[in-house]
Amino acid sequence: MPVVWPKDKKLLLEISFIGYTTFSKSIPSSFRGTSQNLGDIALFSDGILLGETVVVGKAPLAVTEQDTTVFNASAYRTPEGSMLEDLVKQLPGGEIDGDGKLLIHGKEVKKILVDGKEFFADDPKAALKNLPVEMVEKLRAYERKSDLARLTGIDDGDEEMILDLGVKKDMKKGWMDNFMAGTGNKGRYELANTLNRFRDNSQLTIIGNLNNTNNQGFSELQRESSAASGNILNRVGLVTSHSLGMNFTHDWDRVKLRSNVQYTGTDRSEDNSTTVDNFLKQDKSISHSTNSNHMKNHNLTANAYLEWKIDSVTNLVFRPQYRYVASDRRNSGYQQSWSDETLLNERTASNLYDNSQYNLTFMLQVNRKFSRKGRNLALKVDYGTNTSSADRKNFSTTHYFKNDTEKVVNQRVDDEGDGYNYRLQLVYVEPLPNRYFLQFRYSYQYRVTNSDRFVYNWDEAMEDFVADYDSLASNSFESQYSTHLFNMAVRTSRKKYNYNIGVDLEPQKLDSRSFLDDVSKHQMSKTVLNFSPTLNFRYKFSKRTQLQAIYRGKGRQPSVRDLQPVADMTNPLNIRIGNPSLKPSYTNTFTLNYNSYNVKHQRNMVVSLFVENVLNSVTNQVTYDSETGGRTTMPVNLNGNWRASGALSLSGLFKNRNWLFRTYSYLQYRNQNGYTTQNKEEPMKSSVKHLTARERLQFTFRTRQLELSARGEVLYNNSYNNVKDMRTETFDYQLGGDLQYYLPWGFECSSDLTYFLRTGYGYDSSGRKNLIWNCQLSKAFLKKKQLLLRFKFYDILRQEISMVRTISATAIRDADYNVLGRYFMVHAILRLNMMGKK
């Protein structure tokens, strides 16, 4: 091919084609007048189809489209064989917290949808753990309104964060199967299979998992109140799990069906060491305990969603749900308490706990549109019933050193509970001139809860538990909670803005009574009237930039455990007594969100502000006994609990588009109140002012064969308590890197290295550091690379630890947990895409 050569200049040869990367080669001027053979030139796919426009180059990390953040899956690289969980960890503002919950811009994702259809209802972990990354084209994050709000347009305040997965078109032509089997040292094993069939009008997914690597395929419906209930790593303890589930959806002309059923069984062994520093004005109170827990859980859930478009103006929605949980726990522990370096007590204990419970709920909603555009009427009915049964055996020996006495507890506790609740909502929307709408909403909720607790003490002579219950520790309790909600609002929608502004009036009433052998012991009645404005305002600066402000209030009743006036003496050093005098609480929240996307620089920014104030907040009053070192906790109502937070998420590409960045900043100030008292002194208000600041930054360099990331994070916590006049500071530093490299002969290597430094933790405010290194090597086989062999090494340096600090209004709690530790796995992953098969 003849070329017109610039005089005394190099020649830049570029070959491009729509949907492929551009080939570039610099040719020096010395080659002028000669023939050159460039050989075969390969162009690699690098296009993103947007409607009828193909944009060649790197897909933007995230794009803002009105109130939705759209993430392009192709802009993120994950190792071969990765699941959705590995992808969402890379999203700007996305993270998996210690409890395995998915957060986007600090908000918990309640549901994951696949092509707009619910996937295993309200269990996001089902998608995170079981859907392969390779099937996902886009991820859309947004706050979705409730079923009632979507049909009527009325704002009922029941939004939930949603992550909607867009499936690649070529994955909707048949069956897809992802089978994985793995074995490793220390007896580790993993077996999983996900079978999918996605079509435009139907979806079918069957999931099965079996492993002993802490990798539950579904969420556990109930984590018992063990030491593990907190913000800790998923890898805490040793967990064997097995699960099976099916998700089915289908759309007919007038009917939409969403359904799923899932079973999960777990066997968890967990050890922890905990130190508690109580906030007292005079004495220094420290307790230290070690515990060993063995827990087994069996969870069964079934959900369905049926939407029937009866005619062009009438719509019916029906949602039933059934949940069943059975669990047993075995616990043993040792505890010591000190006051000003003096040993006050020591306790050894062992407990057996078995329980079962079920919940059945129904939701029926009917919506009717009238001839005048915008006028509609809706009726929504919710009903639920529940039953629980628990049997506990507690044995402990506590020695008190000051008076040289010993207390032995050997008892059996039978807990039985049941209840029902219903809610009726009536909504009417009337159109007004100039595109305004007047909204009326009335809601009535009624809830009845019954709880029976009977305690039986051990008789040494009989060598059995006595037949008569302990009247001082036993009772029956009933609570009745009712609330009326009156809402009137005006809404409008314009080209640049829309708003919904109104007012809520919500009287709440809580009646409770405690009795034994049909003899009433306590009877209380509390009435509260709450008033709150409501606001939902959205302003669109452009298609890619918008501002939203939301303000609303919501009431909540105290739990039965907080209300029931009976002492739980399971642990004589930590006694808990319910308070039937509690009032319902009322929470006011204000949220401000700003989203913007710069098309030219492919930069996405999300800013959010959040303020919350709780009236009649349920908090704790802790009474400390300086003789025994024991604590008695009782819930009380208290005002002044509030928090405010702000977050910034920013991502995009540099001018050199091989480089990209992600940053997430978070700041929160929280004011927590409670009461502390020593012996029988007057209770003193204990306030904790807590500041949290976090900064996370990541830079990534990417070529066709290599992706290299450097990341860092700083987490700062500062707490001040007025009773102890004490300030605590902790710093958590993370510095790490990720490598993904495509080697010759089809090999792929990926590795991540993270250095952790934690300072200010523990009784002596010491620091801890550790280095975590994980690595994997994989190779694909067969003609279409359907078979993947993978060698994966976890915690190569054996330095993984788990430590958690929890700060309340009355104490600081530091805990260390056992972890899975170092091990390796060999996986075989078979991926079949049976195109066109039915």
Spans of features found by a protein language model:
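Conserved C-terminal beta-signal and adjacent last beta-strands/turns
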Residues: 694-716, 727-838
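Membrane-proximal, glycine/serine-rich, low-complexity loop/turn segments characteristic
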Residues: 9, 18-36, 44-52, 58-332, ...
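Surface-exposed loop/turn segments flanking beta-strands in extracellular/periplasmic regions
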Residues: 67, 214-230, 271-288, 335-348, ...
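Short Pro-Gly-centered beta-turn/loop motif in secreted/extracellular proteins
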Residues: 2-10
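Outer membrane beta-barrel strand-and-loop segments of large Gram-negative receptors
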Residues: 290, 421-423, 467-475, 577, ...
